[in-house]
Amino acid sequence: MDAMASPGKDNYRMKSYKNKALNPQEMRRRREEEGIQLRKQKREEQLFKRRNVSLPPGDESMLECPIQDPDVSSTVPVSGEGVITQDVIQMIFSEDPDQQLIATQKFRKLLSKEPNPPIDEVIGTPGVVNRFVEFLRRSDNCTLQFEAAWALTNIASGTFQHTKVVIETGAVPIFIELLNSEYEDVQEQAVWALGNIAGDNAECRDYVLNCGILPSLQQLLAKSNRLTTTRNAVWALSNLCRGKNPPPDFAKVSPCLSVLSRLLFSSDPDVLADACWALSYLSDGPNDKIQTVIDSGVCRRLVELLMHSDYKVVSPALRAVGNIVTGDDIQTQVILNCSALPCLLHLLSSPKESIKKEACWTVSNITAGNRAQIQAVIDSNVFPVLIEILQKAEFRTRKEAAWAITNATSGGTPEQIRYLVSLNTIKPMCDLLTVMDSKIVQVALNGLENILRLGEQESKQNGTGINPYCALIEEAYGLDKIEFLQSHENQEIYQKAFDLIEHYFGVEEEDASIVPQVDQNQGQYIFQQSEGPMEGFQL
């Protein structure tokens, strides 16, 4: 996900660039919503394994209920294209339990075909999906329950229309009942189906929540001793917590925080990863939600998991920690008190670019805090690494590092800003002035303005009248770049560029081709568009 702020927040922040310090609440950047999407890759990886693997050796029996797997290939005729035959349809509607089982297994195997299971063909066969749902109620025949649940799971792994068919047949309340089945295979298949359904979109997620899944799901997670069941259950739980347009009813999902806090101590990376994903979703919101997550006691363990050896755990743990520090200063301090900064320093050197970017984003929200928090970042030796990232990393990561540095110049003390200058931060900030991303040009201009403002104060205090940072910016070719920005298509950028030159880089003889005219009617500057560098900007 992109970690940039919402347009509203950014616009407000940029409009107040002449203030001595940016509002810390505005400097904090929540995650921009990209729409509710399934973790499709995760879900498809699981289903890929299920569709391609028959019942594993040694797993062909359930507690007091042996799985029956007749040789359906010799019993049921199928055409070369796998078309459903009348014989199979007759068998599934038979009153003979053996015939029902053979036919259901046949459908399940069809639905387990890769890469394109014939889901449309199955749901287009009148009465078949309803028949599967009927079989879910057959508590006297757990094998039939299991096979029907498996078939419905694979139907629900398809498109929204496929999932909708399963919902409309009334399967969800029955699946929730089956979470309390005495047979673990049935429990596991039921929770897998519910995870597929809840993961489709917000409408499906909320329907499953409104059917009352959470108590049974929490109970399953509390008592299950089977790792695969726990994995599927926590994955389903993460799908129930997922989404922002709209988010799930927090009152319905927040009770799962207690079980999630326990799952964070699992030794299984898959369980840890999905528990962290769930917490990242729950913490992605306003401060009251963040506080509820903090109050559940998960922060210290989340910070510990930043050092996990498996990236699939580190990534969601970092996402959750990053979301928590978008809160207020007190909430941010909870994370800092868990010794997060040494962990973040480690992640800033990660070979995985997405981890590095998220770590920069997290630090940027810490440097949007108070001066003591900025000092904590300084004391952890994070800034030298950020400045190196600003020079060498991929652009999306450089953007986050720029936010971190500009936020520190906005809220920092004079001594803290001088420290940043001593690390040679001016040159890489000047280099950002020619990028195509207008928002980052504004961020860089803000950071440089904060440094220049300090220099002006120093020049008045020491009586020299010379701003020491003007020369550093000129040496970094920053003045040339700021002059070019006077022809930028973005009004806020060209006004800021003009203001900086006028205020800090006044020249004896003004060049009429550079100084903008003023449109008296519109109350804004007018610039010659042709003066912009042809390759530097979109004009």
Curated annotation (Swiss-Prot):
Protein location: Cytoplasm
Gene: kpna5
Compositionally biased intervals (Basic and acidic residues): 26-41
Cellular compartments per GO CC: cytoplasm; nucleoplasm; nucleus
Ranges: ARM repeats: 117-157, 160-199, 202-242, 245-284, 287-326, 329-368, 371-410, 414-453
Pfam families: Arm (PF00514), Arm_3 (PF16186), IBB (PF01749)
Listed Gene3D superfamilies: Importin-alpha, importin-beta-binding domain, Leucine-rich Repeat Variant
UniProt protein name: Importin subunit alpha-6
Function: Functions in nuclear protein import.
Claim: Cell membrane is one of the keywords in the record: no
